[in-house]
């Protein structure tokens, strides 16, 4: 046993220090990034935000809606090949190039993903997702996927430390998904005691990944557009959002009614709700590591997308970044004990 003495930070522990700016308007900020990925060699341009691969967020409807903002969607792994075929046949290439095909690490997952990727060459992204990316089996699966799909851009995770970022990139991942326990409906940290404050994880993993020519996506922990800006400021190439995009018409959650008011269910993918829906229940050897919440219906996701992008543009103007690419170089974090004046939050 050992203790690391240095303090690790989450998004709530910092603010971004403002700096002189020559920008006259938020409209002067360019949020689109252009990437060429290390292993696949593929080039992509767009806004580097990703809707999370949860079945109450990462739906076909969400992908269609967010593609108009140049935002990616990691479509959840529980759609059938037949459902994928119908979606591909009814969608334009502009939509499909903003889609990630999500998969687990079983042999059945691999075969299913192979069939989905064969439906249309515009499906260029694969998101290999497990809760614990530290297992040897996971690393081997990433290598297997890279060998099978040499020209596909592979996103793999989740991990929170630099050495595993390096391991996954060397095994074939183009993008490493960073985050254990920060999600709004994730209870891993309280069920297991395992985790890592998200901002520190992003900073450390970005440093490791960029040294090898790889990239990272910050997955979890964002509750406001300001948190998204902090993730990019900390070095994230992409930011994945779950709770911020939940509860919308496109989110896919089941709608329930209480006292005449309608709510949408949103749950973690290791929750009892998710396991009952997809695998028949919680296995006797494990505990649920997610919770289920009821969210008031939030309408179309386009309004939320505009709010997030607007906040991100504003953050860039405060530090003089004319492009999102410049935000990391212009970010200085200050440690704080308060984020906002909360006097009217209960009203």
Swiss-Prot record:
One of its GO terms (molecular function) is metal ion binding. The active site is at 186 (thioimidate intermediate). Its EC number is 1.7.1.7. Pfam families: IMPDH. The keyword NADP applies. It catalyses: IMP + NH4(+) + NADP(+) = GMP + NADPH + 2 H(+). NADP(+) binds at residues 108-131, 216-239. InterPro entries: Aldolase_TIM (IPR013785), GMP_reductase (IPR050139), GMPR (IPR005993), IMP_DH/GMP_Rdtase_CS (IPR015875), IMP_DH_GMPRt (IPR001093). K(+) binds at residues 181, 183. Keywords: Metal-binding, NADP, Oxidoreductase, Potassium. GO terms for biological process: purine nucleotide metabolic process. One of its GO terms (cellular component) is cytosol. Transmembrane segments: none annotated. The keyword Nucleotide-binding does not apply. Catalyzes the irreversible NADPH-dependent deamination of GMP to IMP. It functions in the conversion of nucleobase, nucleoside and nucleotide derivatives of G to A nucleotides, and in maintaining the intracellular balance of A and G nucleotides. Homotetramer. Belongs to the IMPDH/GMPR family. GuaC type 1 subfamily. HAMAP family: GMP_reduct_type1 (MF_00596). This is GMP reductase. It comes from Escherichia fergusonii (strain ATCC 35469 / DSM 13698 / CCUG 18766 / IAM 14443 / JCM 21226 / LMG 7866 / NBRC 102419 / NCTC 12128 / CDC 0568-73). The lineage of its organism: Bacteria, Pseudomonadati, Pseudomonadota, Gammaproteobacteria, Enterobacterales.
């Amino acid at each position: 046993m050992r203790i690391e003495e240095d303090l690790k930070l989450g998004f709530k522990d910092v603010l971004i220090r403002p700096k002189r700016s020559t920008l006259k308007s938020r409209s002067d900020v360019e949020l689109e990034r252009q990437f060429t990925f290390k292993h696949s060699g593929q080039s992509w341009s767009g806004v580097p935000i990703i809707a999370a691969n949860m079945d109450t967020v990462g739906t076909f409807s969400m992908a269609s809606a967010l593609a108009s903002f140049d935002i990616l969607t990691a479509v959840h792994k529980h759609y059938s090949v037949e459902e994928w075929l119908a979606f591909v046949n009814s969608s334009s290439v502009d939509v499909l190039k903003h889609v990630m095909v999500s998969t687990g690490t079983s042999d059945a997952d691999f075969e299913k993903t192979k069939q989905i990727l064969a439906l249309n060459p515009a499906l260029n992204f694969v998101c290999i997702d497990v809760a614990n990316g530290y297992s040897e089996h996971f690393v081997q699966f990433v290598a297997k996927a890279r060998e099978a799909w040499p020209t596909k851009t592979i996103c793999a995770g989740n991990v929170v430390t630099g050495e595993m970022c390096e391991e996954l990139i060397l095994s074939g991942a183009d993008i490493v998904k960073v985050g254990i326990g920060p999600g709004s409906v994730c209870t891993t940290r309280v069920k297991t005691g395992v985790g890592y404050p998200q901002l520190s994880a992003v900073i450390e993993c970005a440093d490791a990944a960029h040294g090898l020519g790889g990239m990272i996506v910050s997955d979890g922990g964002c509750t406001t557009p300001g948190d998204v800006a902090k993730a990019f400021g900390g070095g994230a190439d992409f930011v994945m959002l779950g709770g911020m995009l939940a509860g919308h018409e496109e989110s896919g959650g089941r709608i329930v009614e209480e006292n005449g008011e309608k709510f949408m269910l949103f749950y973690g993918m290791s929750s009892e709700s998710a396991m009952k829906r997809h695998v028949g229940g919680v296995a006797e050897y494990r505990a649920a590591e997610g919770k289920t919440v009821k969210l008031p219906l939030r309408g179309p996701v386009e309004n939320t997308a505009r709010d997030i992008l607007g906040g991100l543009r504003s953050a860039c103007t405060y530090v003089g970044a004319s492009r999102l690419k410049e935000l990391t170089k212009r970010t200085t974090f200050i440690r704080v004990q308060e984020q906002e004046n909360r006097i009217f939050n209960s009203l």
